[in-house]
């Protein structure tokens, strides 16, 4: 558990940051220059707050009022930078050992074999960094940080220097870390795709302040955060459980707050919790439920709000939850002409036709033998 409440004047930017981060991945998201990296730098002890308090697992790392400011090497945090920062003269095996040797043997709870297996780097152990791809370097850097048996793992845009292919290579490994090692992760990014793939908790930072924080699905559903509005086209995220299988038609049934959804076959046990991403561009709206249509997932919904047109398109904020039940927020991106022709207004009941969706973080699950 990370509990942080700090102040820092950084040039013209006044940082006032307070939030709690529990198990799993907590993503710090915001525009460049918002103060995200400054936050993890203060947690690591690389920069000093002007005041406040930082606590990790009940261990006080900084307390301005009590004069506590532990040196970085005494904080037991792992840090993964944008670039791997591996020692070029050492092999991968020796780089990993550097992280492990910083911790007394009695305090180590992460084993080298486990890290090598999880990150898929057994074939790289005798290579030097110059012989590694960008994605391989980042996996080794993650392994070195893990082998320091940290209380928390700090990741400062670790995929920013990688192309899309290398990002896709590394993301599944990061996604598995919290469950495999029970290490909380503080993850800095301004890439929404990464946040949707990894985060359990989202902390939105704007101009040095926490604009919102909480479970990812709840923060994504908030309509009152202007700095976040442009990100909604990335899609809504809906919590779901594997509820059944339609074997003859090759589909898996997912139970969501909005009802059952059909998706591709997935090899996960019944009851497994997953999350579904539904892009705004993949939702069409109808006033009546279509009878003969190829779209398999159709949800009744209420229009909560309609955005202003931009380049001929606008965003429609929907609640697909049951009447009187928990909300299930979705966004649809439609043309201004469609709004006019359908007479769409807030409060109107419509049907949301979901043309596509993607499963998030299914690779997190430890698969049971079948």
Swiss-Prot record:
<dbReference type="InterPro" id="IPR017871">
    <property type="entry name" value="ABC_transporter-like_CS"/>
</dbReference>
<dbReference type="GO" id="GO:0005524">
    <property type="term" value="F:ATP binding"/>
</dbReference>
<dbReference type="InterPro" id="IPR011868">
    <property type="entry name" value="ModC_ABC_ATP-bd"/>
</dbReference>
<dbReference type="GO" id="GO:0016887">
    <property type="term" value="F:ATP hydrolysis activity"/>
</dbReference>
<keyword id="KW-0547">Nucleotide-binding</keyword>
<dbReference type="InterPro" id="IPR027417">
    <property type="entry name" value="P-loop_NTPase"/>
</dbReference>
<keyword id="KW-0067">ATP-binding</keyword>
<keyword id="KW-0500">Molybdenum</keyword>
<dbReference type="InterPro" id="IPR003439">
    <property type="entry name" value="ABC_transporter-like_ATP-bd"/>
</dbReference>
<dbReference type="InterPro" id="IPR050334">
    <property type="entry name" value="Molybdenum_import_ModC"/>
</dbReference>
<comment type="function">
    <text>Part of the ABC transporter complex ModABC involved in molybdenum import. Responsible for energy coupling to the transport system.</text>
</comment>
<dbReference type="InterPro" id="IPR005116">
    <property type="entry name" value="Transp-assoc_OB_typ1"/>
</dbReference>
<keyword id="KW-1278">Translocase</keyword>
<dbReference type="InterPro" id="IPR004606">
    <property type="entry name" value="Mop_domain"/>
</dbReference>
<comment type="subunit">
    <text>The complex is composed of two ATP-binding proteins (ModC), two transmembrane proteins (ModB) and a solute-binding protein (ModA).</text>
</comment>
<keyword id="KW-1003">Cell membrane</keyword>
<keyword id="KW-0813">Transport</keyword>
<dbReference type="GO" id="GO:0015412">
    <property type="term" value="F:ABC-type molybdate transporter activity"/>
</dbReference>
<keyword id="KW-0997">Cell inner membrane</keyword>
<protein>
    <recommendedName>
        <fullName>Molybdenum import ATP-binding protein ModC</fullName>
        <ecNumber>7.3.2.5</ecNumber>
    </recommendedName>
</protein>
<dbReference type="InterPro" id="IPR008995">
    <property type="entry name" value="Mo/tungstate-bd_C_term_dom"/>
</dbReference>
<feature type="domain" description="ABC transporter">
    <location>
        <begin position="1"/>
        <end position="232"/>
    </location>
</feature>
<dbReference type="InterPro" id="IPR003593">
    <property type="entry name" value="AAA+_ATPase"/>
</dbReference>
<dbReference type="Pfam" id="PF00005">
    <property type="entry name" value="ABC_tran"/>
</dbReference>
<dbReference type="Pfam" id="PF03459">
    <property type="entry name" value="TOBE"/>
</dbReference>
<feature type="binding site">
    <location>
        <begin position="30"/>
        <end position="37"/>
    </location>
    <ligand>
        <name>ATP</name>
    </ligand>
</feature>
<feature type="domain" description="Mop">
    <location>
        <begin position="292"/>
        <end position="363"/>
    </location>
</feature>
<dbReference type="GO" id="GO:0005886">
    <property type="term" value="C:plasma membrane"/>
</dbReference>
<comment type="similarity">
    <text>Belongs to the ABC transporter superfamily. Molybdate importer (TC 3.A.1.8) family.</text>
</comment>
<keyword id="KW-0472">Membrane</keyword>
